[in-house]
Amino acid sequence: MKNRNVELINIARIDLLKGKTNVDLEALAKILLDNYDNKFDQDIGFYYEESVCPPNKYVDAIVEEIKTDFYAATEENIEPTTFWGHIHEKNMSTSLHNHDKAYVSAVVYVKIPEGSGDIMFFPQFNQYDNAAYASKFKPEEGIYYIFPGFLNHAVTR
C-alpha cells in the first residue's frame, strides 16, 4: 500500500463536564419539594413543570462548584443567570429542547427514584438523523453535567 500524507482535522467537538457536588442533598431536596407547587409564570419563558427554587446556601455552593470546575476545564469564568427545580413524577419525561440563550447549562441530580429516566444529549452533526450522535447517561445522585446551552437534550421515561 502506498504511504499517503493524511492529517485528521477536528472541525467540531462538544464537551460535556461531569462533576459531583458535596452539598447536603437531603436539605436541598426538602427546599425543592417544599416549592414544587410554586411554578414559574409561563409568560417569562419557563415550562409548566419548572418550579421556583428560592435562593439558598445549597444552590450557592453548587453554583460555586460548577463555576470552579468549568474554569478548571476551560479557563473561562461563567455566571449563572437563572435556575429552577424540575421534579419528575412517575413516568414523566422531558421533551427535546435546548437553552439557546445560555452559553452554558447544567443539570444537577438531587434525588434519583427507582426507574428514573436517562438524560440524552443530541449533537446536531447529521442533518438527516438527529439521533445519529446521541449519548445517554443514567442519572446519579449528586452528579452534575455542564454542557453548551445550544446542545439539544431530553429525559427519557
Regions found by a protein language model. Give the residues of each.
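Non-heme Fe(II)/2-oxoglutarate
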Residues: M1-E76, S93
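Catalytic core of non-heme Fe(II) oxygenases with the double-stranded beta-helix
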Residues: E79-I146, F150, A154-T156
